[in-house]
């Protein structure tokens, strides 16, 4: 694995710099920008009302936040709304500019805290993939600001299981991750990551499967979805080097979040401080986060047994957030659970 990565990094170093032109993502559900912060735009998908806000903490890993609002019948935002959650917001993380290269995990947690305060000081928090780890850290740091917590496909206890991603993180030396940052002059360029991480497969059958499309693969509807997915997948975002190295070392190599050695905004956090309702949603065939790496949170948080819900669905990682069947059935159930908290 290390020798293969070394060859890939050498190939990247010898190649051309990634194109810095940003293509504006397309959103499916009408929204407005409610807040502009250094790390994000806060997008409001609110239908009005006085209900408690639900904040979707999108992944900050490789792709933009339109993962949460991909297409009709493939939108997490729309699924939450249709199930009765009126005030839905999404963290639309910015692609890292050169000026953002020193942004850290704390930089993002600080902006997340500003958002929660803006939403009234207490919110439902839905953490998706890497955003789930951030959401859990935030919930442990500010437990009184969380009404209900949902973690979906989120890495919590890396040593509780094994996935393709965690195998890579454990096998690659820290110097390899640092070299990737150096190639981007202090940032990790999304185009570089895309060349190194070739998941999921982009064959039509694989995309059709993760989207859980009922139509035949040859229909115009399926063809449009395939094109939309490829456009989204080949539009990666850049990451701050400091943040990227902290995630690689602290969360994956050191497993600090699960072992009580993770510091957030000035002090160590303890996951047992998370004592409210929590829903853990895992994918059976997840190549990014093994179900055990997420479901281990059940024994780490301080919530009472009756407040903890878990579910494992038969899909891949992206199928958790983009799959039509999962959104229609599982996420509508989660939304009703949140509304009843």
Where would I find each of the regions flagged by the language model?
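Conserved alpha/beta-hydrolase "acid-adjacent" motif
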Residues: 287-293
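Short beta-strand/loop motif that positions the catalytic acidic residue
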Residues: 274, 280-282, 286
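Short beta-strand immediately N-terminal to the catalytic nucleophile in serine-hydrolase-like folds
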Residues: 125-127, 152, 281
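Alpha/beta-hydrolase-fold enzymes
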Residues: 1-4, 120-121, 134-242
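Catalytic histidine-centered segment of alpha/beta-hydrolase-like enzymes
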Residues: 288, 310, 314-329
């Amino acid at each position: 694995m290390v020798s293969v990565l070394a060859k890939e990094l050498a190939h990247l170093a010898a190649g051309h710099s990634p194109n810095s032109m940003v293509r504006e993502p397309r959103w499916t559900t009408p929204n407005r920008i409610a807040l502009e912060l250094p790390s994000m735009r806060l997008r409001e998908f609110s239908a009005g009302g006085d209900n408690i806000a639900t904040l979707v903490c999108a992944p900050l890993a490789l792709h933009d936040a339109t993962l949460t609002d991909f297409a009709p019948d493939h939108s997490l935002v729309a699924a939450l709304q249709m199930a009765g959650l009126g005030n839905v917001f999404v963290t639309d993380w910015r692609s890292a500019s050169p000026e953002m290269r020193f942004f850290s995990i704390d930089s993002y947690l600080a902006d997340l805290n500003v958002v929660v305060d803006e939403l009234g000081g207490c919110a439902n928090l839905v953490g998706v993939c890497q955003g789930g780890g951030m959401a859990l850290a935030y919930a442990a740091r500010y437990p009184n600001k969380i009404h209900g917590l949902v973690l979906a496909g989120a890495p919590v206890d890396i040593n509780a299981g094994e996935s393709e991603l965690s195998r890579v993180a454990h096998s690659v030396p820290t110097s390899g991750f640092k070299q990737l940052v150096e190639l981007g002059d202090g940032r990790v360029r999304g185009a570089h990551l895309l060349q190194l991480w070739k998941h999921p497969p982009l064959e039509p059958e694989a995309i059709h499967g993760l989207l859980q499309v009922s139509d035949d693969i040859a229909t115009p509807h399926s063809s449009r979805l395939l094109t939309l997915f490829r456009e989204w997948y080949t539009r990666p975002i850049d990451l701050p080097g400091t943040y990227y190295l902290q995630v690689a070392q602290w969360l994956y190599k050191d497993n600090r979040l699960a072992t009580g050695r993770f510091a957030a905004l000035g002090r160590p956090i303890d996951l047992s401080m998370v004592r409210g309702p929590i829903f853990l949603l895992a994918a059976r065939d997840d190549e990014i986060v093994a179900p055990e790496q997420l479901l281990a949170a059940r024994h780490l948080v301080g919530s009472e047994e009756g407040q903890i819900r878990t579910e494992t669905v038969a899909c891949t990682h992206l199928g958790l957030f983009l799959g039509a069947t999962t959104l229609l059935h599982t996420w509508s159930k989660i939304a009703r659970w949140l509304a009843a908290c």
